[in-house]
């Protein structure tokens, strides 16, 4: 059996469910998670259950995709970096063993080196040059879409069976980079990115930095709608 995936997050009053899959026959079994065992309860800065970001944070914490930043903090408003997003996907993939030559010379911390090598070798993320990865560079919302859809195609083998969204319905569609349009249209169609409301209109904010709470929510939707 695999390590299991939380398919329903528990709340203070309702039980949750964790589903395990047999690695040989694909049979599944479930386990009840007691009520009151909110995965993010140990963090002092996570918004309450009524907040839009709570479920995504719970999901990512419960499934080992994201952890805190220390001192009982999750830092939901903190910008997500390139190193962090590849580490999250590496966690999602089960931290497979990697070997080979690392082409990047700017990786200063050990915690993300295996994830960066995995992302580079699979083609999920490339460097900012032949020898630099820029691990501390913030990722934008459109970059998250490109990275996730690239992971879906190159690692999961997902093929498009959906109709891409029409980005022209968003007032800031013109600010989407040409290289990100297809991936962002797919991400919107799959419910991974829904846009941000402002003044009665919904904006994509493709150049906006992706916060940890946004990434957690996007990842939850990705796991439920794409990586099934």
Protein language model annotation of sequence segments:
Residues 1-38:
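Extracellular modular ligand-binding repeats in secreted and cell-surface proteins
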Residues 35-54, 67-114, 125-142, 150-181, ...:
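Feature responds to low-complexity, polar/acidic, surface-exposed segments characteristic
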